[in-house]
Amino acid sequence: MPGSIVASLIFLLIPLTLLPRCGAADSITTYGVVPNKTCGGSGNFSSDGGIVFQMNLRQFLATLPSNVIKNGGSFNGSVGSTNAVFGMAMCQADLPWPDHCESYLQAATAEAPKACPSSFNTSVAYRGCVLRYWDAPVHADVADTQFYYFGVYKQEHAIQVVRDAAALNQTRKDLFENLSSEVVSSPLMIASGNRMFNSTHNLYGLAQCYRDWPKDLCSYYIRVVGGYFGYIDSQTWDGLSFASYAFYLRYSFF
């Protein structure tokens, strides 16, 4: 497992109570803005090639939200034959569908060029949606660290004290082990499930991968990151989620 993921799991903890509420599988979970951008591949946008790239980018971004909705929450495409734009976008599966997904992507497509005004390679995360574009094809199986993470959120309301941490960790690990197999069997690359814990708590888990991501990578990261939840989760947090540009996990009690 790349060290960058372990570091993020330990140090990048953002309380969900600071974020705007929107619906999910259970009524007490919140998701919202994660101020995140990565700008790369800066160049001369005033050159002939840069001007053509910007034209292609505007066309790609203008149709991206509707393309994501038509494609069930995930999209990968390109625009242009020369100085082409290649991009992808994904909405988290527990966003209210389709309104929130579409409106958040509309905001992301409007802000991405402003956030990285001279970049040919841009990654943006906004309210449970991710958007990325490049000036060349990018294969999901390359060593692209931007596919890995941008945030870990903890849920702090309706807190419950779990006294048997070892049993909780094992139950949660077993749940995500199972979801790591189920998610790659789903055409939408989404899976969810429940596990009883101590006969008193129902543990809900959700796993999602970017649909064009290789299935072996999807299964690997769902399994491994799900297992690492126990290293950062205290016994008083009621839930946790892990967001990246290629996969998303969350668990909560209900």
Q: What is each PLM-predicted segment?
A:
Residues P2-F254:
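Extracellular secretory-pathway ectodomains and N-terminal mature segments of eukaryotic proteins
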